[in-house]
Amino acid sequence: TDPVAERRDCLKGQFGIRIGSTNREATVWADVIVLAVKPQMLSAVLSELGPTLAHALVISIVAGVTIRTIVEQAGGATRVVRAMPNTPALVREGMTALAMGAGVSDDDAGLVRTIFETVGRVVAVEERLMDAVTGLSGSGPAYVFQAIEALADGGVMMGLPRQTAELLAAQTVFGSARLVLESGVHPAQLKDRVASPGGTTIAGLHQLEQRGFRA
């Protein structure tokens, strides 16, 4: 469902999916329901859906709303999973954290993992850690984008064309992240391999430390 008819029709045409004009209409036949609304809209949506959620596996990507809140407000939902994906999912390089509710079966958990693994990597965490996940991987892309922009700006300041500087910065971040993931080597060790004694890299790292990069 979508409140804008044109968007519903566009999704139907693009993916060949069933659409509905109301949330209740959509949930009647759905085995899996994804709650993807603003936190301030959730109460109204759950009130509308009510007992129709009882038969379905409910996946919530609503930031800051607990499983308990959803169960209490939904009036029947017992199989609830909280998920925190991030925007790199748009290019299938996302990171999603999942917190499983008490009523979620192993089959349910496997299905949810499969869904989110189509757009990146998945990790299961205790629900009490979801706020930390939100700050790290949920908001993390924004921090990385700013770092890429800063690296590129430095390159431009040194005379590189903007497009070249952005490519150098983005690919450096991408490759470095992949090296961490695939090598299994601690980032500190990888950093030390780049920093020669008395070289430019260690000088740059010193400046980052002096200016509160870790803070």
Model regions and ranges:
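Small-residue helix-packing motif on alpha-helices
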Residues: 8, 26, 161-168, 190, ...
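Internal alpha-helical scaffold of NAD(P)-dependent oxidoreductase catalytic cores
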Residues: 69-79, 95-133, 144-182
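NAD(P)-dependent Rossmann-like dehydrogenase/reductase catalytic/cofactor-binding core
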Residues: 170-215
